UniProtKB/Swiss-Prot annotation:
Gene3D superfamilies: Mannose-Binding Protein A, subunit A. It is found in: Secreted. The keyword Heme does not apply. It comes from Bothrops moojeni (Lance-headed viper). This phospholipase A2 inhibitor binds directly phospholipase A2 in the presence or absence of calcium. Has anti-enzymatic, anti-myotoxic, anti-edema inducing, anti-cytotoxic, anti-bactericidal, and anti-lethal properties against basic and acidic phospholipases A2 from Bothrops venoms. Pfam families: Lectin_C. This is Phospholipase A2 myotoxin inhibitor protein. Glycans are attached at N122.
């Protein structure tokens, strides 16, 4: 959308710089201005629609972060690239409501998924007896949102975390 707006501005700028002797009444210029204004309104409408959907999904999950699965099953190695290419990150719930939103996805799919726990995490949800590095060096969440040590070779549900700074 921004590319279209920039193209319109470029055309308008070129037109103004060169002038147009075949359009003395300025019909082309007026048409370009009208088109640009229409595109600006459309962009504003799309932005509003996007923000409305984001707010509704955030409201429904109780979290400003969205957790989404592509339904694939993978080990930990490709997960960072998969999420990054989608514009997200490996899940890293920082608050209880974020962990609940993450767990809702796992419960819907009846599968566990990887997450990343930061060194300075203020929130954790380790299951009893966890973490246990004997089970592995990665971390997975079960369908209830409890965290467990896991092998990084386990094939788990691919879930990515998305959040928007507005």
């Amino acid at each position: 959308m921004r590319l279209i707006l920039l193209s319109g501005l470029l055309l308008l700028g070129t037109f103004l710089a060169n002038g147009d002797e075949t359009d003395p009444d300025g019909q082309v210029l007026n048409s370009l201005i009208e088109t640009l204004m229409h595109l600006q309104r459309e962009f504003a409408n799309l932005k509003y629609a996007f923000l409305t959907v984001h707010k509704a999904r955030s409201f429904g999950s109780g979290s400003e972060r969205l957790y989404v699965s592509n339904k694939e099953i993978k080990n930990f190695e490709p997960l960072g690239d998969i999420c990054s290419q989608a514009g997200g990150h490996i899940p890293s719930p920082q608050l209880e409501n974020q962990n609940k939103a993450f767990a809702n996805v796992l419960e819907r799919h009846n599968k566990a998924a990887y997450l990343v726990v930061g060194d300075s995490a203020n929130f954790t949800n380790w299951a009893a007896g966890q973490p246990n590095e004997a089970d592995g060096t990665c971390v997975k969440a079960d369908t209830h949102g409890s965290w467990h040590s896991a092998s990084c070779d386990d094939n788990l549900l691919v879930v990515c975390e998305f959040y928007f700074i507005l």
